[in-house]
Swiss-Prot record:
Species per Swiss-Prot/TrEMBL record: Brotheas amazonicus
Name listed for the protein in its UniProt record: Venom peptide 3
Superkingdom, taxonomy of origin: Eukaryota
Tissue: Expressed by the venom gland.
Localization terms from the record: Secreted
GO terms under cellular component: extracellular region
Amino acid sequence: IGDIWSGIQG
């Protein structure tokens, strides 16, 4: 996804 939780590429 690339949100706060998963960082950039999560």
